UniProtKB/Swiss-Prot annotation:
The organism's taxonomic lineage, starting at the top: Eukaryota, Metazoa, Chordata, Craniata, Vertebrata
Intracellular or extracellular location(s): Secreted
Record organism: Sus scrofa
Span list, region Disordered: 68-104, 120-146, 255-290, 548-582
Protein's UniProt name: Secretogranin-2
InterPro entries named among the record's database cross-references: Chromogranin_CS, Granin, ScgII
Length: 616
């Protein structure tokens, strides 16, 4: 029992001690952790004082290397297993059992530990380097507080003396540094090897002998030839220097050849330069040539048109001078027109009008002429003819006053008024009569009454096709195309009364005196015929008779007469409507100029486009 009690007491005491030790250890560790958290420098110092197990392994490996070095010094013979690389040795050391690791004595272990501790003191940051991963930035591996340079690491002298690092990149058979030197020293030429070398050299000499002799002969011949040439040239140079004064002597043939070559080169260079200059001139002059071509073409066209117009004018002047005009007014007006010299500007205007209006120059001049008639057999002119009854005039005729005038045919079959495609080409508010009035000419419709169905002998006249630059004047239409229409028109106006003629004449004279009833856009001037005193007396009598008749008529009939009078041509003296004509002429002139400018711009663009297409 006593033994059991003592056993329990001992166990209890041991438990108490154990609990006390654990409590003290925990308290100490708690205090230490608090200190380490507050002061990290102290933690580093404590860590650096104790060697890590990796450091101990490294020290063991170093000691083994040292022992191997001592063994190599004692036994210089070659060890084939000595050339194993460092990682293989580390593997072998790691594979060794613990019993072999513990084979070291206690004194050696103490020495190793002391050296490790000294090394840890000298290198305070070595443990941090081993524990932390390696980074590219070397500044982060070394703290800023470190006063010593990393190159001032002091290794033990004994360790530096005895450390032998095996080469990593050589073969295992050459790991021993003494091997090659020993082989070189031990190698010696034997008499057998010397004999073989001599025989090899002799055979090589036999093979290369004849070739060398041939080469030597060729070299000797060349040397002799060059020596002879040098002697000849030296003599020539000496003689030439005496004459010329020290200049190099060259044969005459070489000089001639060099001169000819230089001349050929100069001529080639000059030819190339001239070709380049010509190409540049052609390139620069292409645009100028195009402009010149355009100008020449325009001038040629103008000259052709001018020649045609002048030739036709000459023919007309000759016809006027030879023939006698039945109408005195028309002859006087024609003489006045052709007595004035035509300037170039008016001719160009006539040409532009003939192009833009698509009217031949002959018909355009007929419109400008006053009273010339192409044929001698001309029927006498008739007076103004008015229908018997005013109701017979249809609304179509009233709305289109120029209907009969447009249907008249010229001597060549062209209408003298813009009743065809000409009016479509002209802008609004313009007519051929307005353009001719601007030019200072009188229209043929103003000098001849528009209602003359039998003006010419139509049996002798044939119409002509519309004007075009590519059409021949010989293309003519048959008579049956237009003769029935003319006969119908002639029959329509055969049944006119004398009273209606007198009434029409009187209305025309009244409208001359009172022009305000007429529309300004439809004013058409007809020259008043020169009347004698007898005519004036007759007119006065007619006026009185018509006034009495007008008083008897109702207001409706007077309105109808006024409408008819608007459609009839009116004789307006130049002295009465001079201011109105001035304003009308100015407006019409602006319209004509705008129209001509537009036509010129369009034609110029078309011409340039055609030229560009041709050049392409």
């Amino acid at each position: 029992m006593a033994e059991a009690k003592t056993h329990w007491l001992g166990a209890s005491l041991s438990l108490i001690l154990l609990i006390f030790l654990l409590a003290t250890a925990e308290a100490a560790s708690f205090q230490r952790n608090q200190l380490l958290q507050k002061e990290p420098d102290l933690r580093l110092e404590n860590v650096q004082r104790f060697a890590s197990p990796e450091m101990i392994r490294a020290l063991e490996y170093i000691e083994k290397l040292r022992q191997q070095a001592h063994k190599e010094e004692s036994s210089p013979d070659y060890n084939p297993y000595q050339g194993v690389s460092v990682p293989l040795q580390q593997k072998e050391n790691s594979d060794l059992p613990e019993s072999s690791r513990d084979s070291l004595s206690e004194d050696e272990w103490m020495k190793i530990l002391l050296e490790a501790l000294r090394q840890a003191e000298n290198e305070p940051q070595s443990s941090l380097k081993e524990n932390k991963p390696y980074t590219l930035n070397s500044e982060k591996n070394f703290p800023m507080d470190m006063p010593d340079d990393y190159e001032t690491q002091q290794w033990p002298e004994r360790k530096l003396e005895h450390m032998r690092f095996p080469p990593m990149y050589e073969e295992n058979s050459r790991d021993n540094p003494f091997k090659r030197t020993n082989e070189i020293v031990e190698e010696q030429y034997t008499p057998q090897s010397l004999a073989t070398l001599e025989s090899v050299f002799q055979e090589l000499g036999k093979l290369t002998g004849p070739n060398n002799q041939k080469r030597e002969r060729v070299d000797e011949e060349q040397k002799l030839y060059t020596d002879d040439e040098d002697d000849i040239y030296k003599a020539n140079n000496i003689a030439y220097e005496d004459v010329v004064g020290g200049e190099d002597w060259n044969p005459v043939e070489e000089k001639i050849e060099s001169q000819t070559q230089e001349e050929v080169r100069d001529s080639k260079e000059n030819i190339e330069k001239n070709e380049q200059i010509n190409d540049e001139m052609k390139r620069s002059g292409q645009m100028g040539l195009q402009d010149e071509d355009l100008r020449k073409e325009g001038k040629d066209q103008l000259s052709e048109d001018v020649s045609k117009v002048i030739a036709y004018l000459k023919r007309l002047v000759n016809a006027v001078g030879s023939g006698k005009s039945q109408n005195g007014q028309n002859g006087e007006r024609a003489n006045r027109l052709f007595e004035k010299p035509l300037d170039s500007q008016s001719i160009y205007q006539l040409i532009e009008l003939s192009r833009n209006l698509q009217i031949p120059p002959e018909d355009l001049i007929d419109m400008l002429k006053t009273g010339e008639k192409p044929n001698a057999s001309v029927e006498p002119e008739q007076e103004l003819e008015i229908p018997v009854d005013l109701d017979d005039i249809s609304e179509v005729d009233l709305d289109h006053p120029d209907l009969f005038q447009n249907k008249m045919l010229s001597k060549n079959g062209y209408s003298k008024t813009p009743g065809r495609a000409v009016s479509e080409a002209l802008p609004d508010g313009l007519s051929v009569e307005d353009i001719l009035n601007l030019l200072g000419m009188e229209n043929a419709a103003n000098q001849k009454p528009p209602y003359f169905p039998n003006q010419y002998n139509r049996e002798k006249i044939l119409p002509r096709l519309p004007y075009g630059p590519g059409r021949a004047k010989a293309n003519q239409l048959p008579k049956a195309v237009w003769m029935p229409d003319v006969e119908n028109r002639q029959m329509a106006y055969d049944n006119l009364n004398d009273k209606d003629q007198e009434l029409g004449e009187y209305l025309a004279r009244m409208l001359v005196k009172y022009p305000e009833i007429m529309n300004s856009n439809q004013v058409k001037r007809v020259p008043s015929q020169g009347s004698s005193e007898d005519d004036l007396q007759e007119e006065n009598q007619i006026e009185q008779a018509i006034k009495e008749r007008l008083n008897q008529h109702s207001s409706q009939e007077t309105d109808k007469l006024a409408l008819v009078s608007k459609r009839l041509p009116v004789a307006t003296p130049k002295s009465d409507d001079a201011p109105n004509r001035q304003y009308l002429d100015e407006d019409l002139l602006m319209k004509v100029l705008e129209y001509l400018n537009q036509e010129k711009a369009e034609k110029g663009r078309e011409h340039i486009a055609k030229r560009a297409m041709e050049n392409m």
